[in-house]
């Protein structure tokens, strides 16, 4: 059904090589928008054989100084009218990056996706991660310039990266106040809304808050304490006093991107 995650029904069937098998599919739509989809998973292979299925990836990882692994999803998994039933990467990609990491721990992961992905193992083990989103036909150039230092990244996440689906309410209940989005989520996310890194560091100081009638003016100073020029995105969030109503935990009220040498 379109108003909830897909139901994944599995059955174990023994198949013999060289034989043809007939598959009977019974489908019933009792109302609303419903669809069925069949998936095929290749027989389990040894992990090393699985690496070989990806061409020369395993060999290249052994020979290079640093491995850049591009992972993610595309419109075959998530698009308008089709939602994912899990926040994780496809199982073969999870196995792939684990094996690549064993071969060469100096690995960079580039994520390609249009939404958040639960990359818990990658976060714990891979030393560098860059989220490329869906970058377009010049995306490779943009990623390369960021990785090789020609461009110092300064982007910030426009959404929350959760650890798992267990942290979210049922898919068919999109009541935001039940823990959805950074405004109402009370747990500790994998990456929070507004999170982002660069090749330099910044320091905030001299915070001054002045109130005049219904207007609040906030001023502060930002200095670049690192070795490289870079962009910082200053963000101002507000929290509401107890009012008896279920107000957001916090809300973004202002932000500005500034380049600091």
Residue ranges and their predicted role:
Residues 1-66, 81-83, 88-92, 247:
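Acidic/polar, compositionally biased interaction segments
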Residues 48-124:
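Hydrophobic helix-and-loop "lid/oligomerization" segment in the mid-to-C-terminal part
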Residues 244-261:
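Intrinsically disordered, low-complexity Pro/Gly/Ser/Thr-rich segments with frequent PxxP/GP/PP motifs
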């Amino acid at each position: 059904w379109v108003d909830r995650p897909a139901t994944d029904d599995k059955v174990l069937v023994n198949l013999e090589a060289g034989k043809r098998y007939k598959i009977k599919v019974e489908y019933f739509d009792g109302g609303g928008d419903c669809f069925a989809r069949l998936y095929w998973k290749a027989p389990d292979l040894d992990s090393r054989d699985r690496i070989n299925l990806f061409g020369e990836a395993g060999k290249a990882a052994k020979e290079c100084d640093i491995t850049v692994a591009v992972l993610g999803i595309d419109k075959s998994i998530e698009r308008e009218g089709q939602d994912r039933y899990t926040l994780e990467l496809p199982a073969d990609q999870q196995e792939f990056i684990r094996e690549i990491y064993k071969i060469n721990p100096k690995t960079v992961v580039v994520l390609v996706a249009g939404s958040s992905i639960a990359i818990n193992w990658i976060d714990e083990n891979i030393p560098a991660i860059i989220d490329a989103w869906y970058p377009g036909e010049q995306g490779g150039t943009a990623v390369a310039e960021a990785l090789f230092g020609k461009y110092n990244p300064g982007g910030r996440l426009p959404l929350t990266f959760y650890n798992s689906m267990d942290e979210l309410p049922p898919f068919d209940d999109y009541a935001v106040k039940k823990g959805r989005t950074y405004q109402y989520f009370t747990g500790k996310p994998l990456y929070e809304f507004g999170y982002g890194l660069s090749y330099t560091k910044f320091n905030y100081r001299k915070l001054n808050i002045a109130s005049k009638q219904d207007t609040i003016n906030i001023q502060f100073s930002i200095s670049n304490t690192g070795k490289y020029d870079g962009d910082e995105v200053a963000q101002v969030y507000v929290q509401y006093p107890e009012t008896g109503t279920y107000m957001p935990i916090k809300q973004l009220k202002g932000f500005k991107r500034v380049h600091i040498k």
